[in-house]
């Protein structure tokens, strides 16, 4: 059984027991969170597709960790001008463990 849900403007395909990195959520570590914007639920041959969401379906998860991702370097290089600009960015994330899919 797996489900596709939306969080932080992105869609995630998850199954029970899986650990997923999402955009930062303002929830403390160890707390439970429910995602009710479930777009699709597949249970064997039974496929439920929402228009746009599946009514009554939700994905239940537990927050495992909060953190920042690896550094991404942004470089602007101007040829023949002896000029360049360098910048770095680390995106915040929330790691959740999927504990249940209800449809």
Swiss-Prot record:
Family: Belongs to the bacterial ribosomal protein bL21 family.
Subunit structure: Part of the 50S ribosomal subunit. Contacts protein L20.
Pfam families assigned: Ribosomal_L21p (PF00829)
InterPro entries listed in its UniProt record: bL21-like, bL21-like_sf, Ribosomal_bL21, Ribosomal_bL21_CS
Entry protein name: Large ribosomal subunit protein bL21
SUPFAM superfamilies: L21p-like
One GO cellular component term: ribonucleoprotein complex
Ribonucleoprotein in keyword set: yes
One MF term in the entry's GO annotations: structural constituent of ribosome
PANTHER family named among the record's database cross-references: 50S RIBOSOMAL PROTEIN L21, LARGE RIBOSOMAL SUBUNIT PROTEIN BL21M
Source organism per UniProt: Actinobacillus pleuropneumoniae serotype 5b (strain L20)
Encoding gene, per UniProt annotation: rplU
Gene Ontology process terms (BP): translation
Keywords: Ribonucleoprotein, Ribosomal protein, RNA-binding, rRNA-binding
